[in-house]
Every structure is written in structure tokens, then in C-alpha cells.
């Protein structure tokens, strides 16, 4: 039986971030090209940069996963395969997918390429995961709202690899189901153009106690951030995730700087290695 060693998966929005992730110890890097990605405002990779990145990663025995994780319109599908083909031929290790039509098209046209179900698919239970497995998916990025026990059960019941977010920003809504940006800014978060209205301050208006509609004065409270979640950090729970044999530990941040990518990746690399190769690391994990 192969010895367990969870994959550390780091983000890259630029070539400098890719190099930083590799240097800091990432086993794999996920990144987006100029099309079909859920981070339209990241640097993203041109065709030439992506091919260069694949060559660099494979030189260091690291993997590259390409994000094709947005909802796709009918007139965009025709150019999908031509866009993916050079990366597939260069040994692209996997594609992270949201759209079901994209999934089917990739499965038929690129045999042997790993297909990963994006967190944007909102996979929360085993029947959904098994359906995706029947369509060729080999790895699930489960909804970030799931508990560790739910993820563990999902893995046991499906036999699929689990890629779990361990660090970074969280959406206030279920992954892949948010329409807030579309409502307020006319920019679809499910098409890679989220305006992040949940990160903005809001003025909370109310009534003084006992005032009701008739008697009380309108009360204006200082601006607050009621919808902006704190960032995720699982370092204190890393031993439990590794005990659950999570397959891939994913850091959020394709719009972050190379310094951020390098720093966070190095920290998780250190503690993952300590847990794998020593017995006293768990006591030293505090964020």
C-alpha cells in the first residue's frame, strides 16, 4: 500500500507566484489562463507563460492544474478544445471544472487528463459526487461549508480524492451559488468577475429599543462588515485533516502576491512535513 503523503496545492496568478510556490515547497500549483477562469482580475497566464510554467513545474517534479471553473456560455464552448489542446499535449496534470458542458467536452476530447470538480459545483453529499464520478471526475473540491466529518464520509462513500481548502478567503454564500455581485454590481461571481460586495462596509439602520414604527427615533450605527467572513486557517486542525487522509491541501489566493504565496506555502509545508515525519509537531500549531 502506498504511503500517505497529502499534496500541498498552492495558488499562482502570475509566473512569479508560480516560482514562489515551487520554491516554498508546493507539490502542485493551480492557475488560470486568459479564458474560462474564475479570477478574471488576476494576472493569469498567457499561452506562452502557461507552457513555460508547465515545463518549469515538471522539471521540479511538481504538478499543474488549470482552472476552467466558470459557467460557460454557448458561443464560448466552440473554442474550448483548441484552447486546451497545447496544454494537454505539454502534459497538463489536471483541469478544475465547474460547468457540466465543459466537463463532458473535456472528457470526450482529452482522454487520460484528470478532471477535478471545482468547489463552484457545490458538492455537499455523496450522490452528487458519485454522479460526477460516473462522468469521469477523479477528484472533488467539496463545498467549503462542509465539516471534516462530512468530508471524511464523502471520501469513504465515493472513493474519490478530496481537495480541501485550508487557508484563505471565504465566501459568505455557498460556493458557486452567490448572486450578490450580479445583483449589486452587474458582475457575475460565477463568471470570474466578482465585485466582492460582501467585503464592503454597510451602515446598519434600526430603531431605538421600544420605538417601533411610531414612537422611536431612527438610529444609525457605525459602518460594519456584517457579511465579510474571517479568512480560513486550519493549522490548529491540520493533524485531524491529515489523519482523515485528505488527498490535497489547497491554499486560496490566485490574486495574492508572490510574497504571500511563498510565506503561506512554506508554513504549511513545514507543519505537514513535521506531522508526516515527527511525532511532536501537533503541540506547536497555533495561528
State what each model feature region is.
Residues 4-28:
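N-terminal basic/disordered segments at the start of proteins
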Residues 8-11, 29-31, 64-68, 95-97, ...:
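Hydrophobic faces of well-ordered beta-strands that scaffold small-molecule active sites
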Residues 21, 99, 132, 164, ...:
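Conserved, mostly hydrophobic/aromatic
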Residues 30-48, 68-74, 254-261:
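Glycine-rich, proline-tolerant flexible connector loops at the mouths of alpha/beta enzymes
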Residues 41-51, 100-106, 145-157, 258-260:
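Active-site-adjacent beta->alpha loops and helix N-cap segments on the catalytic face
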Residues 47-109, 114-122:
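Active-site beta->alpha loop and helix N-cap motifs at the rims of alpha/beta catalytic domains
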Residues 114-247, 261-264:
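Catalytic alpha/beta core domains of metabolic enzymes, predominantly
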Residues 277-282:
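Conserved small/polar residues in nucleotide/adenosyl-binding loops
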